Design a protein with these regions (language model features):
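Short, basic/aromatic recognition patches
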Residues: 18-33
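Phosphate/diphosphate-binding glycine-rich loops and adjacent basic-rich segments that engage nucleotide
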Residues: 151
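Zn2+-dependent cytidine deaminase-like catalytic core
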Residues: 53-146
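Small-residue (primarily alanine) positions within well-ordered alpha-helices
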Residues: 24, 42-43, 72, 76
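Short beta-strand scaffold segments in enzyme catalytic cores
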Residues: 37-46, 122
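Short, basic, low-complexity termini and linkers enriched in Ser/Thr/Gly/Pro
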Residues: 1-10
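Short, compositionally biased leader-like segments
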Residues: 12-22, 125
């Protein structure tokens, strides 16, 4: 169930990209997307091995819609996590993965709030996945260090 986080510390397993992707695919099936029919799932790996899943949650007014990536991050932050290693993201029409969909700009900035340039993203498509870093998708970013004049 989505309310129970997966933890490699409890099971002794190594969280591979493929396992993280499987958790993102599982999360995608919980999306609430009655308007677009576009389902997105994410699985966020914390530095301690805990994984948080998230799905997109649409709203009739569209503005309040929340992306899968932010859902996963917000759940993890609420539980006290601040160190993250990677995220797997998948999406597609009516729950069928149709291509790799990079995070939107708002999600990228949320990631930047908590993650360094080397944070890994696995962008899933129907034939596999592409590995990129946060710096790849958000160069010249506005980070907490820049905000505080430390960068």
């Amino acid at each position: 169930a989505l309310c129970i986080q997966h933890s490699a510390l409890l099971t002794g397993e190594i969280m591979t990209p493929e396992k993280l992707i499987d958790l993102a695919k599982e999360a995608m099936m919980h999306a609430y997307a009655p308007y677009s029919g576009f389902y997105v799932g994410a699985a966020l790996l914390c530095a301690d091995g805990t994984v948080y899943q998230g799905c997109n949650i649409e709203n009739a007014a569209y503005g309040p819609t929340n992306c899968a990536e932010r859902t996963a991050f917000f759940k993890a932050v609420y539980d006290g996590h601040r160190d993250f290693t990677a995220i797997a993201v998948c999406g597609g029409k009516d729950g069928v993965i149709t291509g790799a969909f990079p995070p939107c700009g708002v999600c990228r900035q949320v990631m930047r709030e908590f993650c360094d340039d080397d944070f890994v993203l696995y962008l899933v498509d129907k034939d596999g996945f592409e590995t990129v870093t946060l710096k790849d998708i958000l160069p010249h970013s506005f980070s907490p260090k820049k905000h505080m004049g430390l960068d």
